[in-house]
Amino acid sequence: MTLLQERLFAMQDKQYAAFQAKLTPGVPVESFIGIRVPVLRKFAKEFTKEAECEDFLHQLPHEYYDENMLHGLLISEVKDYEECIRLTENFLPFVDNWAVCDIMSPKVFAKHKKELSAKIKTWSKSSHVYTCRFGIETLMSHYLDKDFKTEYLEIPASVRSEEYYVKMMVSWFFATALAKQWDATISYIEQHRLAPWTHNKTIQKAIESYRITPEEKEYLRTLKIK
């Protein structure tokens, strides 16, 4: 066991490990240490100041799920854009579950929207489930507000995948887009631009959203594919 692993096990909550394992199917139960996210997030902020941090970011693959979660949190704190992209692309092939994928949210991306959009297009076309999911999630996080362009909707709309965690992210994206950019997005639902399962899941998520008006929800119900 490495020194870092010893430090991680010192934060272990075995009941939480069992809980995480149930939420993350496909990941071996024995790979969960069981560190609560707020605790791990606090540790990550301190660990970024340590010399061992850089070594850890190059030691792939990791043995434990919690190490991968830590890796994602550390990438989120990297301040140099080019370095962040390099570390992200080195790590993505090793991401094997939705939780690690979704914990990554690099703060530096917000300052580099122009360059980032090209990366998002590449990631979203990936055949690797979680690289594709990360690309769509990053688009959703950064390009549905003041930086929105209608053409960005084509990126997730063009994704063709039978992978559950990709389809769910496309649905999540379009439900969020309906909430934030209704006029530009509704035609994708009206014209059945999405696969039937994704189409209906988008409508379901949008109807569950407090950001969609009652009138919009009523209209969306008429657009379900039966």
Question: Language-model features: where?
Answer:
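Alpha-helical scaffold domains
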Residues: 1-226
